[in-house]
Amino acid sequence: MDYHILKKYRYTNRNQFESIYSSRYKNELALHYDFEIHGFPCFSLPTTEILNLTSRIYKLTQTLIYLKSKLPQIALEQYTQTCLIDEVKLTNEIEGVNSTRREIQDILNTQSITQKNIRLYGLVQKYNLLKNSEKISIHNCSDIRNIYNELVSEEIKNNDPLNLPDGIFFRRKSVSVYSPHMKEIHRGISGETEIIACMEKALFILHNKSIPPLIRISVFHYLFGYIHPFYDGNGRTNRFISSYLLSKELEPLISYHLAKTIKQNISKYYKSFDYTNDTDNRGDLTGFITNFLEIILASIEALIDSLEDKIERLHYFEQILLSNFKDKTDYGILHLLLQNSLFGLEPLSARKMAEMLDKSYVTINNRLKKDSIKTLLRSDIPHKYDLDLDILKTL
């Protein structure tokens, strides 16, 4: 039986609305949270759908880990970086902040901060930490503010300094979220004292180990959005925290696909916030948890589909290379270019190839001039190379 949001019963079954709410809230399996939405204590139910989603998420995470193990190291590094770049670009895009793949790639390549890249540097570096399984403290309001500072404060300062937090940790004044037609759809918690109190409750829920991990992560994602602790940057900070938590609970690669899946389902994502915020929903978080778990599952499924396709193509082209190139250095160069063509974002220079293959630049440059190799190269950018897979197919 489908689990309908409470608000729906207010209009379709008014006579039973109170009894349906009461039966849900008092259900012996209900999880109760020390947090109120419009005066109603929050709760959720472990529906069959939530249990199935959770089970499938953990099962497919193991499939994803297995597929990662089938990739050559260079292919895995290139694929991870490609996903990271797309995640940063899309988490900005959701908020209407422009950033290009080239800007993000340059920060990852140079690892240095400049006046030109300062607005994105912190965001990129923070996401880059996820692939290395580094620990980030998310235990108190100071931690939340530190994450915000490192992620988005420079970009917000450059764009509109008045949108920077004016309290100890968070904003002091009120803030609202508006629809494209300028209708107020949500008003964040008012006053920094109350914001701090609510955030501390949300963090307690996040670290309450009596609650299943994916439920905690989903609930915290909602509560952060409901509290809306900053004037600007709430969405990016919230998504990063969820990405970090998922990287720890599941697999780091999943953390680089959350914004993409949210953007693909943006209407459903915002709608789940809207109806959970509604007074008639009476603090029932079950629907939001279900939708957020669906987003996590869709992220994993998309990664699996992508990797399965790329691994199949990799094996196909590897056989062509093995049949046609017996020289180890020639094969090594072409195999590297094959991995980059399938899994990377930008072509490789001879110097980069020399570094990756531990060969001299002269050796790589001379081999690239060989007719048997040169005919397979595509060079859309001067002195940078990819394999032309259409030509490789004909061998």
Where are these regions (language model features)?
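Phosphate/pyrophosphate-binding active-site loops
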Residues: 2-49, 181-306
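A generic short alpha-helical patch detector that favors 3-5-residue windows
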Residues: 56, 76, 80, 96, ...
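Short amphipathic alpha-helical segments and their helix-coil junctions
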Residues: 60-71, 125-131, 200-206, 268-277, ...
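Active-site core of Fic-domain adenylyltransferases
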Residues: 81-83, 89-231, 239, 243-256
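C-terminal regulatory or interaction extensions
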Residues: 221-229, 239-395
